[in-house]
């Protein structure tokens, strides 16, 4: 067996790991998601999936050709192609991603397709982390930077003046940030984390030299979670009544729209459709797996 000596410096300062995917998102919204992350400083994305529709494969292929996306196929660990079966593969996919990239990523960014960690004061992740560490008064970075979850429910009224596929610009009303460690998303040092799951580093190495986690102040950044409200009519009404408008994302608008427009133009030249493509939808994707008998 060949011995591979890892690079002394990680190739990527920020790399995204997406677990076994479920839920739906159209191809244009996926482009906005990946381009927003790239604008903030992410230089590689690792996605785990069981099967992809032709439209999604084409969109993914565009980003694979650019060298910014790696797709790993991971069928469910049991012959159950429902949402429940899909979730069983999530821990394995994230820990596989962490191990694969332990010496490639300085920071592993754990998010899903309907989430993005957005700075409220800074233009990119590098400047944001520099500010966080300065506030902490230490030079040594921590193992995990944890960002509180904020729901940007798609039930809230959208800003119709924004383009239909620019989800982060259209939906700017959010509920109260969740408590610390309740459904957060994180930046993780993969060389100091022994086990990871979809919110933060679960177990650090016993001799880890760094502080375990930082609860990032919500005035600095939050994890924006775009989804339908599923908490029941009464609670959803309460969320809606107390929702606040956050326009801090609009400072990214010009650059983000340019990036998305350029990417969509490239996809059109490649004859890639911009119609709705089911990325990670359990009923669609795992149905495809059954049909193809992977």
Describe each model-derived feature in a short phrase.
Residues 49-50:
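Acidic ATP/Mg2+-coordinating residue in the GHKL
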């Amino acid at each position: 067996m060949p011995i591979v000596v890892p690079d002394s410096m990680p190739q990527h300062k920020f790399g995204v790991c997406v677990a076994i995917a479920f839920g739906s998102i159209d191809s244009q919204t996926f482009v906005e998601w990946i381009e927003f992350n790239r604008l903030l400083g992410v230089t590689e994305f690792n996605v785990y999936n069981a099967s992809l529709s032709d439209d999604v494969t084409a969109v993914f292929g565009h980003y694979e050709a650019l060298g910014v996306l790696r797709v790993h196929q991971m069928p469910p660990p049991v012959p159950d192609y429902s949402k429940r079966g899909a979730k069983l593969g999530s821990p394995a996919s994230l820990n596989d991603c962490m191990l694969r990239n332990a010496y490639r990523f300085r920071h592993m960014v754990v998010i899903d397709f309907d989430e993005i960690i957005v700075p409220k004061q800074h233009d990119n992740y590098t400047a944001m982390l520099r500010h966080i560490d300065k506030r902490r008064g230490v030079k040594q970075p921590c193992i995990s930077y944890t960002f509180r979850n904020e729901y940007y429910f798609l039930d809230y009224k959208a800003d119709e003046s924004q383009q239909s596929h620019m989800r982060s610009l259209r939906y700017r009303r959010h509920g109260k940030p969740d408590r610390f460690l309740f459904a957060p998303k994180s930046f993780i040092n993969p060389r100091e984390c022994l086990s990871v799951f979809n919110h933060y580093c679960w177990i650090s190495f016993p001799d880890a030299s760094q502080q375990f986690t930082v609860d990032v102040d919500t005035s600095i950044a939050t994890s924006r979670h775009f989804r339908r409200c599923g908490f029941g009519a009464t609670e959803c009404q309460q969320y809606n009544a107390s929702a606040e408008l956050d326009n801090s994302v609009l400072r990214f608008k010009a650059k983000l729209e340019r990036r998305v427009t350029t990417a969509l133009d490239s996809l059109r030249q490649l004859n890639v459709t911009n119609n709705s493509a089911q990325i990670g939808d359990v009923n669609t994707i795992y149905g495809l797996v059954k049909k193809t008998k992977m």
